[in-house]
Amino acid sequence: NNILTIFYAGGNKLYADSITVLKLTKVINDVLTRYKVKSNTFVLGGYSAGGMIALRYVELCNEFPAKFPIQPKGVFTVDSPIDIFSIYEQLEESARNNYSELAVEEAVRAMGYIKEDHGVPRENISTYAKLTAFSMNKDYCQNEMFLKNMAVRTYHDVDIAWRIVNRNQTVHGSNYEVIAELINRLVLMGNDRAEFMQSFQTGYRSNGQRHPHSWSIVNEVEFMQWMKGLLK
């Protein structure tokens, strides 16, 4: 397809803090210098937390164009948690309910990563409002305004039964509940290129394990056609 693909490893970061933004900018500057590509021919995206980081980075590119090296054409997320405030509340609920041992372990670990950085989000709203890509609570921030004119795609395997059986969680514990609100707000702003890409039972890990939180939920052929259309 003649498309240069760059992978960036963000470690355990769940959002685009100043260090992550700086590192990603360095990678992009290196790409611009090394491969002589145009600064307006980038599509950013990521899986899980990588999607949160990509989404926030694109927002920052649009909010502060003079401070960032590229003008992205589009952004995509793959079952990404994008609202740090909602994420933390969902994690607290999972740990408190104790419905699933695995869900509790995941929740405690993720809450630890968050608290180590800037504490509990609702107790430090001003800081986390600058880090999160989106907030269900408009009083916290409305960073989605910087995606108003951007092509945005979010991918999800909407298998509610799997969540109930394997995690004892409902739709409320899903990433797509929050993402649907993001896409709806963008559509209400007049963005006809904001798309919620829904599939069903498409998620499988590389070892064949059924899991809706997987890269495989993206239709690769159709995705490439979408991206090539943006880069024309």
Question: Could you tell me what each predicted segment is?
Answer:
Residues T33-R34, S39-N98:
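Primarily recognizes the serine-hydrolase "nucleophile elbow" in alpha/beta-hydrolase
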Residues Q71, M145-R153:
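Short, proline-enriched alpha-helix->beta-strand connector loops that line the catalytic pocket
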Residues D17-T20, R56, S86-Q90, V165-R167, ...:
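Short, solvent-exposed loop/turn and secondary-structure capping segments
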Residues V152-W162, S174-K232:
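C-terminal catalytic histidine-bearing segment of alpha/beta-hydrolase fold enzymes
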Residues G11-Y15, S48-M52, S80-F85, S135, ...:
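Solvent-exposed loop/turn segments at secondary-structure junctions
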Residues N1-Y15:
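Conserved alpha/beta-hydrolase
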Residues Y88-M145:
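Mobile cap/lid helix-loop segments that gate and shape the active-site cleft of serine hydrolases
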Residues Y15-K36, R56:
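Alpha/beta-hydrolase active-site loop
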